[in-house]
A protein has these predicted regions:
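Short juxta-domain linker segments that transition from a proline/glycine-rich
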Residues: 8-11, 18, 22, 28, ...
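N-terminal intrinsically disordered/low-complexity leader segments
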Residues: 1-6
C-alpha cells in the first residue's frame, strides 16, 4: 500500500511511541540513549518530523529492533487500522487548519493509547461503511462549522462585490443577466452556449457545466430564469476576481475532490448573492417589513420580486445578513421538492446553523409533518398559485407563508418563513424553501409581527 510523506511520519510516530510505552521509557530516557533532544523526539512521535537515516538507526538501537522493522509498515496488526484511516482520505482532505489544528494534533491524541486508538479507528471505519459516510460528508460538515464560526457573514466578500460594481470596468451598468454575460464574454473571453444542456439526454437536469481553457466554455441551461442565469454568471465573475483555481465544474456536485473546492464554491456563491442582491436594499426592505405589526405576504414577495431574486437566493441572502444587521444569531434553511406523481416530499437541500433538529423528508401520512410551513404551501399550491402575482402564469406564481411552530419532541419554538413555486427545470413539480429562526427575545424585538393573531401556532415534528 503506497503512503505519502505525511502518512509515513504518522506511522513512524505511532510505532516509536508504542515501542517507548512497551519498554517503559520516558522521553528523557530515549533522548539520552539516542543522543537526541527531548523536543525533537516529541515532534517525531507526534508525526510532525521524519528523522534522517542515522537518527533512525540510533532509535532502532535504543529500542533493540531492526532498522527495517522500524521503517516498514507491512505485517503489523496494530498498524492496520491506522493505515486504513490514513488512506481513507479523511486525514488527507479534512481541513484541520480551519479549526486551528493540524492532522498531527489529532494523531497525537490517538497515539496516547495505541490499542484503544486501533479499536476506535476500526469503530469509525465500520460506522462509516454501515451508514455510507464518505469524506465529502465530513467536508460539507466542516463548511457548515466554518459558516457558523463566522455567523454566515463575510465582509471581505461583501466588499469585493461592491468594489466590482463601483469599478470603472463595470461602469455603473445595471446588474442583470445581459450585462453580466457580456462582461464574461468580453473580459473573460468566455464562450457561452445555451443550446446543449436543455435537450441533452443525461445533462438536461444541470443548470450549468464549465470547461476550462484559453477560451473557457460555459454551457447554460436555456430553461433557467434570467435571475438564475445571472447568479451563475456572478459566480464565474467571482471565480475570476477572487483568484480561485480549484473549483467545481458542474452546477450539481458529481464528485467532491477537496475541502478547498467546497469552500471556493461557497465563496463564489456568496459573492454572486452579494453582487445581485446588495445588502443595503435587502436590509432596508426587510426592516420595513419587520416593523409592521401584521404579516404581509404580498409585501414579502414584492420585496423578493423587486430584488429580481429567486426564493432560494432571497432566503440565503437573508440568512447571510441576519446576524450582522438584525442580531438573529442562528437559523436554518431547507429546500423541499415534491414531484407531481409522488406523495413524498424530499428535503433536497439543508443548512442548519441552529440547534433545532430537522427532518430529512416528509410524508403526507405523518400528521405533525403536514403542519410545517413549506409542507403546507406545497399541499395548498393547487389553489394558492398566482395569488401574489396574477400577471405570472398560474403554475409558476410563488406563494408565501409565515408560521409560529413548537417542536413536539423538544419544546423548541421557531418562527419561519416559507415560499413555494414550480420548479424551473421541471414545471410539473413544485419546490418550497423555508427559513427558520429560534423564537427568542432577539427575534421578538426585530420581527414585530411575531405575535400576529392571524398566524396560527402549529405543533410540528421531525417524524
Amino acid at each position: 500500500m503506497p503512503f505519502n510523506e505525511d502518512n509515513l511520519k504518522f506511522i513512524l510516530g505511532f510505532k516509536l511511541k508504542n515501542l517507548r510505552l512497551q519498554r517503559g521509557y520516558s522521553l528523557k530516557d530515549v533522548a539520552t540513549r539516542a543522543n537526541m533532544s527531548i523536543s525533537y523526539l516529541s515532534e517525531i512521535e507526534k508525526g510532525k518530523k521524519y528523522p534522517k537515516a542515522e537518527k533512525l538507526l540510533a532509535l532502532a538501537n535504543c529500542y533493540e529492533v531492526g532498522y527495517d522493522e522500524l521503517v516498514t509498515v507491512d505485517g503489523q496488526d496494530n498498524l492496520n487500522p491506522l493505515a486504513e484511516s490514513l488512506e481513507s482520505g479523511f486525514f488527507q482532505e479534512f481541513p484541520f487548519q480551519l479549526f486551528g489544528l493540524q492532522a498531527a494534533d489529532l494523531f497525537s491524541l490517538l497515539t496516547t493509547s495505541p490499542d484503544k486508538a486501533g479499536a476506535l479507528i476500526r469503530t469509525f471505519l465500520e460506522i462509516g461503511q454501515m451508514y455510507d459516510v464518505r469524506v465529502e460528508h465530513f467536508l460539507f460538515a466542516a463548511l457548515r462549522a466554518y459558516q457558523k464560526m463566522h455567523n454566515n457573514y463575510f465582509e471581505d466578500l461583501e466588499l469585493a462585490a461592491e468594489s466590482f460594481l463601483e469599478s470603472d470596468i463595470w461602469g455603473g451598468k445595471p446588474v442583470n443577466e445581459i450585462n453580466l454575460r457580456r462582461y464574461l464574454e468580453v473580459n473573460g473571453r468566455y464562450i457561452i452556449d445555451e443550446t446543449l444542456l436543455a435537450d441533452h439526454p443525461t445533462l438536461h437536469s444541470f443548470r450549468s457545466v464549465f470547461i476550462p481553457g484559453k477560451r473557457p466554455r460555459l454551457f447554460l441551461n436555456k430553461r433557467l430564469l434570467p435571475s438564475q442565469k445571472a447568479f451563475i454568471f456572478g459566480k464565474e465573475i467571482g471565480t475570476r476576481l477572487l483568484g480561485i483555481e480549484t473549483r467545481a465544474t458542474t452546477s450539481s456536485w458529481i464528485k467532491v475532490e477537496s475541502f478547498e473546492q467546497v469552500l471556493n464554491n461557497y465563496r463564489t456563491s456568496y459573492f454572486a448573492g452579494a453582487l445581485l442582491i446588495g445588502r443595503t436594499k435587502v436590509v432596508g426592505g426587510l426592516s420595513q417589513l419587520f416593523n409592521q405589526k401584521t404579516w404581509d405576504p404580498v409585501g414579502f414577495l414584492g420585496l423578493m420580486k423587486s430584488l429580481d431574486s429567486t426564493p432560494e437566493m432571497f432566503f440565503y441572502r437573508i440568512g447571510q445578513l441576519a446576524h450582522n444587521y438584525f442580531g438573529l444569531s442562528s437559523h436554518y434553511f431547507m429546500r423541499l421538492a415534491k414531484r407531481d406523481s409522488e406523495d413524498f416530499i424530499d428535503v433536497s437541500k439543508m443548512l442548519n446553523l441552529s440547534t433545532i433538529p430537522l427532518p430529512r423528508g416528509f410524508s403526507n401520512s405523518e400528521n405533525y409533518c403536514r403542519k410545517w410551513a413549506g409542507m403546507k404551501l406545497l399541499a395548498d399550491r393547487t389553489w394558492e398559485r398566482g395569488i401574489a402575482f396574477p400577471d405570472l402564469p398560474a403554475r409558476s406564481g410563488p406563494t408565501a407563508q409565515a408560521q409560529r411552530s413548537n417542536f413536539a419532541n423538544t419544546g423548541q419554538e421557531v418562527f419561519s418563513f416559507a415560499v413555494s413555486r414550480a420548479m424551473q427545470l421541471s414545471p410539473s413539480d413544485d419546490s418550497a424553501v423555508i427559513l427558520g429562526f429560534p423564537m427568542d427575545d432577539a427575534l421578538k424585538s426585530v420581527i414585530r409581527f411575531w405575535d400576529d393573531p392571524a398566524l396560527k401556532d402549529q405543533l410540528v415534528g421531525i417524524t
